[in-house]
């Protein structure tokens, strides 16, 4: 059974647009789980553009919500994650001017730092994932760093599919990375830019155990509601 994680960052984006308390990410997080999602993903960015520290505290504190907290390599953010003890953390690259995460981590450049961070989370029994581009070298490095999981960046294949361009090579990259990850004992997740069609295509890769989807689900739910949107994704991923 493949799992579905729902990123609710843009619930916070809507709230922050009016500087108010509504919609409340914590309330939506609980609703997402009731609607059938396995987990909730939130990204505490350094600039706090959507999710705030108080959101992290409330969501991580709830035992009814399996929380995947996305964080950068920033010490302040790492300390907040350690204090609040989510079920998972996913280390992602972060640039202040980007609209959304633009690519995977540079594991070679940040190897020593990432390994020490993973060690901190492992000691607290917090599972650690690395957000990486689909290449075999990074899968091998993730194993060296003692990461529990990797989340493969699916932005490129998503764009190719949406533009009706050939995506065969990118699909094979993701498939080979997924196979190697499982062979090395690493759990493989996928996320970024996913919609119904792209998720349907990638769900054929049996080694991928989890899809993390945010923007499309939040947007689609404005028309069809969270329950129906989440149900459709669960049906797609487990055909």
Swiss-Prot record:
Q: Tell where it localizes.
A: Cytoplasm
Tell me the active site: 43, 70, 192
The residues annotated as site (Transition state stabilizer) are 151
* Alphabetical list of SUPFAM superfamilies matching this protein: Pyridoxine 5'-phosphate synthase
Q: What metabolic or biological pathway is this protein involved in?
A: Cofactor biosynthesis; pyridoxine 5'-phosphate biosynthesis; pyridoxine 5'-phosphate from D-erythrose 4-phosphate: step 5/5
Q: What is the top-level taxon of the source organism?
A: Bacteria
Q: Which residues bind 3-amino-2-oxopropyl phosphate?
A: 7, 18, 193, 214-215
Root EC class: transferase
Biological process, per Gene Ontology: pyridoxine biosynthetic process
Single GO molecular function = pyridoxine 5'-phosphate synthase activity
Record: residues binding 1-deoxy-D-xylulose 5-phosphate: 9-10, 45, 50, 100
Q: What's a single GO CC term here?
A: cytosol
For this protein, the Enzyme Commission number is 2.6.99.2
| Keywords noted in UniProt | Cytoplasm, Pyridoxine biosynthesis, Transferase
| Reaction(s) catalysed (UniProt annotation) | 3-amino-2-oxopropyl phosphate + 1-deoxy-D-xylulose 5-phosphate = pyridoxine 5'-phosphate + phosphate + 2 H2O + H(+)
> How does this protein assemble?
Homooctamer; tetramer of dimers.
Family assignment? Belongs to the PNP synthase family.
Summarizing the function annotation, the protein's role is: Catalyzes the complicated ring closure reaction between the two acyclic compounds 1-deoxy-D-xylulose-5-phosphate (DXP) and 3-amino-2-oxopropyl phosphate (1-amino-acetone-3-phosphate or AAP) to form pyridoxine 5'-phosphate (PNP) and inorganic phosphate.
Stored PANTHER family: PYRIDOXINE 5'-PHOSPHATE SYNTHASE
Protein name in the entry: Pyridoxine 5'-phosphate synthase
Q: Which organism is it from?
A: Pelagibacter ubique (strain HTCC1062)
